[in-house]
Amino acid sequence: MSKEQCVTDRLQGMILGVGIGSCLGAPHRPSVRKGGIHIDKLTGVISHPITVGKNCHFNIGIGGDCIEMTIALIQSIIQSDGYDYCNDRYHKSIWIETNSPTVGDTTKRNIEKINNNMAIPTSKIEALIKGVPLNEYSRASNGALLRATPLASIADDEERRLACIYECCITHLNPIAVICHIVFVEAVRMAICGYSKKYIIKRCSEIILKECKNFDTQMISLMIGSSFVETNTNYSYEFLKKEIMYAFNSACKGKEYDMNNREFRCIQSFYCAFLALTHSDSFQDGIETIIRMGGDNDTNASITGGLLGAYFGRKIMECDTKTLENIQIVINAEADANEELSEYVSRPPLYHLSEEKLIKMSKDLYVIGLL
């Protein structure tokens, strides 16, 4: 394949990975309240719908908020020929206004606060941080990381880094979440560009140390001053390095990590992505391993799927019979609800992942990203 074909293949893998992770993981969430199906029934093939509310379901192959917000961000990047914070907020607002069943109340509330209260940011990130209204997501959760993969297509290194911070400003402005965001996006970009696992891990380790130091000296006082992070937590260089490097090294060495602490969902997802990257020989093996670990397994599977898909690419993914079947299920799923089955709900057409849309998005991101 030519360079363009190789890169667009990996970009398609990235997008498909997010969608498959969502569809495959969500039905097996441990919460019975959300209609979770026991993990023992995981076959590796998408065969259950995602439950929305008590009695409503998507059609099989329709993913949740992970893939919808990923597509919304892709649309924003393509329209802006790069990352534009205001346009990104606009596309997130459109997503909310579609009344998609996947829009969570807290996410909706926080994005609406941003749109209602925040002026257009200046070129300085400090001004942006000071202007963001306080919200419930000022903690190390994974709600920003789940939509992060498209940021890897941004060509300029510093613009890409700032885009990660801007994204976290919308819903998850926490030092841990921001650093995990930056490192994960760099890993996805390196995977898209065809770098080896060994090189990706080496560079990510260096980036973690660099970003922990940056935040220790430049950002933490601003965040704490804006009441965005708990003031009783010492977000020093040593604290950040300890927490993030411990998860990163545990993943790379195949060691277990605590998956039950709700305040550290972002690090858990970060851990899952790098565990699967370093210890899986195929997309299918990696994604099933993460789902079986429990915890926030649908979001973890989507985030992991984005990185694995970027690394393996669509053509290699399709060499596995289960993954090939899942790809066909996702891109051929019916977006509209079955009118004869009133408990089935529709996805907004804007976020439906068809073969045609997948090809167009990958080609557009290739051009924008100078990949």
Predicted regions and their residues:
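Structured, active/binding-site neighborhoods that engage oxygen-rich ligands
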Residues: 1-371
